């Protein structure tokens, strides 16, 4: 029964990942999340049910639009598969229903923010601020850490990034501060320190590899959000 539920969560994650793709594409552009329906951004072709199957339709169509032949962005199957695997992994590591629900919500926020930052270089207030609020709410109703730890974690996360911004005169932004505040609100101050340290390591290594592969200039801005999100997921699952 446990395996069946895990498989169900994986499938749910695939479906939710499909919705997250809509948010990732439309929210930064100021578009409605409801209208118009899913369509090819190149030719406007409205997608049919068979073209909306998570991961499967991408493979079936060989990564191209059936109408115009335009390449479908790799992000679509990546987000769907990542969310499916993530949902199943969170169930595997959760010891209670409340921990599972909180984990799924937190992971969902991280996925959306990471890919928006990766593509657009922003971390929208429409997601970060409600994310902080949800972290506080779960603490208040007793589903996670004590309220004082949630509040302290959010303040520490926000304050650390703001301090770095002021001292370095750039390099990070207020969106990064709010994302780390989300981490603190959900997981507490210890998670903030862990995530900031390992995100810095991951961001440095990843940044060097990115510049080497793309041959871009060292002044090219590299989003920090994905590194923080990755470190936060590791903390959520294993610590």
Residue ranges with predicted function:
Residues 1-4:
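Short, strongly hydrophobic alpha-helical membrane anchors
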Residues 6-21, 80-85, 165-170, 181-239:
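Alpha-helical transmembrane segments
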Residues 25, 87-91, 110-117, 135-142, ...:
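Structural signal for membrane-spanning alpha-helices in multi-pass inner-membrane proteins
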Residues 30-31, 65-76, 115-129, 166-178, ...:
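Interhelical loop and helix-boundary elements at the membrane-water interface
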Residues 89-102:
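Transmembrane helix-loop-helix
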């Amino acid at each position: 029964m446990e395996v069946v539920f895990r498989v169900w969560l994986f499938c749910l994650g695939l479906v939710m990942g499909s919705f997250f793709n809509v948010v990732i594409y439309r929210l930064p552009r100021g578009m409605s999340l409801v209208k118009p329906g899913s369509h090819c951004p190149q030719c406007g072709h409205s997608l049919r049910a068979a073209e909306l199957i998570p991961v499967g339709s991408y493979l079936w169509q060989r990564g191209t639009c059936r109408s115009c032949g335009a390449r479908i962005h790799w992000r679509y199957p990546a987000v769907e598969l990542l969310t499916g695997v993530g949902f199943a992994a969170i169930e595997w590591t959760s010891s209670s229903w409340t921990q599972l629900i909180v984990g799924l919500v937190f992971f969902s926020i991280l996925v959306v923010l990471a890919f928006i930052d990766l593509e657009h270089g922003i971390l929208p207030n429409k997601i970060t601020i409600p994310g902080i609020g949800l972290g506080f709410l779960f603490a208040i109703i007793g589903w996670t850490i004590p309220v004082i730890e949630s509040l302290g974690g959010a303040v520490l996360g926000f304050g650390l990034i703001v301090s770095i911004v002021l001292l370095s005169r750039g390099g990070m932004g207020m969106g990064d501060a709010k994302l780390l505040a989300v981490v603190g609100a959900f997981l507490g101050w210890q998670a903030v320190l862990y995530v900031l340290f390992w995100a810095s390591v991951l961001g440095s290594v990843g940044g060097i590899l990115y510049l080497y592969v793309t041959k871009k200039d060292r002044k090219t801005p590299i989003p920090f959000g994905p590194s923080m999100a990755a470190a936060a997921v590791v903390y959520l699952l294993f610590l």
